[in-house]
Amino acid sequence: MKHIVNLLFVISSLSATTINVPSSDYLTIQAGINASVDGDTVLVDEGIYSENLILEKEIVLASHAIYDDLDSEWIDNDNINNTIISGAHNGSCLVIKDGNIGPTIFG
């Protein structure tokens, strides 16, 4: 599994951009998703995010857990436990709009 994850990142990173959330440019996960293009990675820092997310692109949406020392341990359980998307208390927390796309979600 570790090798598959690493391969996905190598392939997606050849011409892809990593968008860090939150940052001065992207305060919300959805802002990062909106700014992304197919092949990009939206990398979410620890925190509680009250958002309803809509994915319409082939991107990687991930917590920092997948980026923490990939050579020795690719899962950081503390980071996963501290990165929460709770929704905005209405509707679905995550909607993938197009059944023909394949976003990747980690951590």
In which residue ranges do the predicted regions lie?
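Detector for repetitive beta-architecture
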Residues: 39-41, 46, 52, 58-60, ...
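Terminal export signals
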Residues: 12-15, 31, 93
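Right-handed parallel beta-helix/beta-spiral solenoid domain characteristic of secreted/periplasmic
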Residues: 24, 59-107
